[in-house]
């Protein structure tokens, strides 16, 4: 019982860390901090938050979906995860545009402008954000919803939460990404594999957008 309470407390503090980071932008705006100081603070905040969340993952130990894996196994699944995520993103994005006449991803374009203006912000966008999102939406939400529901319902709920958080015009693309990364997490049995795939995918999409 004490072990369960300790795990639940760990998950709570992981989620709280993420919420505090998401609130940082609002706090900085209220303090009228803008421009470079604003993005420097967000970047540093994201590094601290991601580091703390990684520490909390290590502290909690593996959950029911996780096993100790080899580097070769992890690299193979990162490649599968990245290629699948990129292909799925373009496929669903094309279908979404064709059927619903949705515009380009407002979220991607906004991040692109920020990274162009403040290059160091890529640390947040390409590295810290994917790590934190995988820990929150796959390890905290998805993994903890599997037992009270089932793996499919858990994946759908966590994917919709992931899409809702991004507040983007291409909602279906983010739902698909959420489902795909849940699949990669389940199959690889390692949260850092889905995080690695997410990092490489973000880097690829933003690099292609810049070119």
Q: Language model features by range: what are they?
A:
Residues 10, 14, 66, 154-155, ...:
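Alpha-helical transmembrane segments and their helix-entry boundary regions
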Residues 23-28, 159, 170-211:
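Functionally important transmembrane alpha-helices
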Residues 43-51, 119, 123, 172-180:
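Membrane-embedded alpha-helical segments of multi-pass membrane proteins
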């Amino acid at each position: 019982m004490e072990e369960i309470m300790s795990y639940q407390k760990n998950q709570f503090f992981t989620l709280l860390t993420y919420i505090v980071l998401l609130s940082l932008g609002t706090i900085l705006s209220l303090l009228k901090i803008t421009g470079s100081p604003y993005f420097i603070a967000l970047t540093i905040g994201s590094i601290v938050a991601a580091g703390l969340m990684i520490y909390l993952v290590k502290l909690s130990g593996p959950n029911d979906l996780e096993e100790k894996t080899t580097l070769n196994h992890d690299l193979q699944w990162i490649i599968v995860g990245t290629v699948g995520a990129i292909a799925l993103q373009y496929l669903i994005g094309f279908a979404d545009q064709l059927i619903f006449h949705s515009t380009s991803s407002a979220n991607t374009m906004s991040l692109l402008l920020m990274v162009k203006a403040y290059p160091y912000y890529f640390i947040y966008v390409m590295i810290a954000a994917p790590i934190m999102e995988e820990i929150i939406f796959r390890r905290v939400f998805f993994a903890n919803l599997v037992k009270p529901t089932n793996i499919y319902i858990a994946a759908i709920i966590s994917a919709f939460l992931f899409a809702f958080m991004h507040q983007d015009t291409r909602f279906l693309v983010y739902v698909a990404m959420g489902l795909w990364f849940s699949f990669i997490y389940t199959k690889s049995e390692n949260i850092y594999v889905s995080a690695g795939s997410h990092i490489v995918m973000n880097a690829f999409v933003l690099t292609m957008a810049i070119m």
